[in-house]
Design a protein with these regions (language model features):
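Conserved catalytic core of two-metal-ion nucleotidyltransferases
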Residues: 59, 63, 69, 76, ...
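Conserved nucleotidyltransferase catalytic core and NTase-mimicking acidic/glycine-rich helix/loop elements
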Residues: 34, 126-259
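N-terminal regions immediately upstream of nucleotidyltransferase
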Residues: 1-66
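Generic structural signal of hydrophobic/aromatic residues within well-ordered alpha-helices
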Residues: 6-17, 23, 27-30, 34, ...
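Active-site nucleotide-donor binding segment shared across nucleotidyl transfer reactions
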Residues: 42, 52-91
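Glycine- and acidic
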Residues: 36-45, 83-88, 149-153
Length: 259
């Protein structure tokens, strides 16, 4: 699905931003346009790619000219407004540019994941370290009551879906590229089975749709339980959690076999 012209028009302005005040205006307008795109049910992954590129172009533009290296979701092409923008390096004023329009942003904690997402060299033993870090993020199983997911169980889309899947994808294909692309490359590298990659891709897209919808509704930063989700979202979230749990079990088992 092609992006709406309003998105394309704004993305053309970003690299030519001439001041940090203009940057704030572009970031604010981007959120308005993104809300319209969500309302029209545009593709969530394409919207994340667009938003990531916009953030990157603004940070590198003449008016901002920040010396930092973006990492995390923005560097991968996975950025959403509800996910903090993170970077490596120092720029005391950059956080304020984002905060002024209601966006979270800060310097990243130095880690192998941050370095990989920023496009820095992995180093010896790096892939094993990424695998161990990813498997350490395996989400807990959904609590069940009478054979059904406990409706009082906490919902944390980032912690139970997005972060674990991004971590596995980072191990499968280190380098600053979108998570869905990393998963596909992981199959080519024979680190992921086709079934595991497809399952994680589905869970990732589900998580992105849910996260973007909660941002659109203005509740993405509020604590929530399964009971708070609409029935279809509740079912989708539960299914995605089970998919991720099964995929992590499969990947962990394969990793043990290759030791």
């Amino acid at each position: 699905m092609a992006l709406h012209q309003s998105l394309l028009d704004l993305s053309e302005l970003a690299p030519h931003c001439q001041s940090r005040a203009t940057a704030r205006g572009l970031l604010a307008e981007a959120q308005d346009i993104l809300r319209n795109a969500v309302a029209h049910q545009d593709n969530e992954i394409e919207l994340a790619h667009w938003y990531s590129r916009l953030i990157t172009d603004i940070v590198r533009s003449p008016g901002v000219n920040s010396p930092v290296h973006l990492t995390g979701a923005a560097a991968r092409g996975d950025q959403l407004p509800s996910i903090p923008v993170v970077w490596m390096g120092d720029d005391a004023d950059l956080q304020e540019v984002f905060a002024d329009v209601g966006l979270q942003a800060h310097a990243a904690t130095d880690s192998i994941a941050a370095r990989v997402d920023a496009g820095l060299p992995l180093g010896n033993g790096g892939e094993q370290a990424l695998l161990e870090e990813a498997l350490g993020q395996r989400p807990p199983a959904l609590k069940m009551v009478d054979g059904l997911p406990d409706r009082d169980a906490a919902v944390d889309i980032k912690a139970t879906l997005l972060s674990p899947i991004a971590a596995i994808a980072r191990w499968a294909a280190p380098g600053p590229r979108p998570t869905v692309d990393r998963l596909a490359i992981g199959v080519e590298r024979d680190l992921l089975t086709t079934a595991d990659a497809e399952s994680l891709d589905l869970a990732w897209r589900t998580g992105y749709a849910l996260e973007l919808r909660r941002w659109y509704e203005g509740v993405s930063d509020r604590p929530a339980t399964l009971r708070d989700l609409p029935p279809l979202d509740r079912t989708a979230y539960g299914s995605a959690c089970r998919i991720v749990s099964a995929a992590f079990e499969s990947i962990s088992r394969r990793a043990e076999e290759y030791k």
